[in-house]
């Protein structure tokens, strides 16, 4: 990843992707390096993270809070203003992770600038896990911004029905709701009220979705029908996408079920066993 990162003369870094510079690739690279830095404690990753952060800032119009999503890698000219709404959430998440590493207020300021613009728009269009991640990350540091918490709950609530009704095995919905659940818990811990939020419905949908998503898990009984069962055993597939198995889908499933395990442990700790005291 570090070898593929391209630097300008001003120590601004991007991750080129098939002749393009995209907000997506640079944000994901920064998040991955931030994970490495936090997990290993190796501060040697921070300069690369800061350079990628500067690259993300170069895509940001500070007057409007909007990102340019795609540049031409050959001359850094603007190629596409918006390619995917979820990329905004990726950019905000990356900037917040960088703030967590460096405590440089520039990164948090930029993240809030983008979120302020997103809040003014229709939250229903951001029905994705990256928006949920962005709100979870920013509320770790901007707990005085009640509007961010409100936006997080609205984002979850307007997307509950679509996640519940989804019959396929796409993993994004489960992770989105679990991340939103974390933000909801942080909101309560910060002393804010969440009156009107359908928390019990959220818990019900999370449980249903976690069970339904297992239809895409390749148990031995499913894997045996593939040409090379040993290569797919224990993987996740997306049934509605031609039984496709992808690295991104695997990451989403692992991320979602990891959060679900933590969520279930927390629920168990909060609810006394029916046998307690028997």
What is each model feature region?
Residues 21, 41, 79, 83, ...:
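Structural signature of alpha-solenoid helical repeat scaffolds
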Residues 25-63:
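A charged, solvent-exposed segment within the mature domains of Sec-exported extracytoplasmic proteins
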Residues 27-43, 90-104, 130-144, 175-196, ...:
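Well-ordered alpha-helical scaffold segments within catalytic/enzyme domains
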Residues 165-278:
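CBM-like carbohydrate-recognition segments
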Residues 44, 79, 106, 147, ...:
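A structural signal for alpha-helical segments
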Residues 8-31, 65-90, 131-146, 156, ...:
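Carbohydrate-binding/catalytic loop surfaces
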Residues 1-11, 47-66, 100-124, 142-167, ...:
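Long, well-ordered core segments of solenoidal/helical folds
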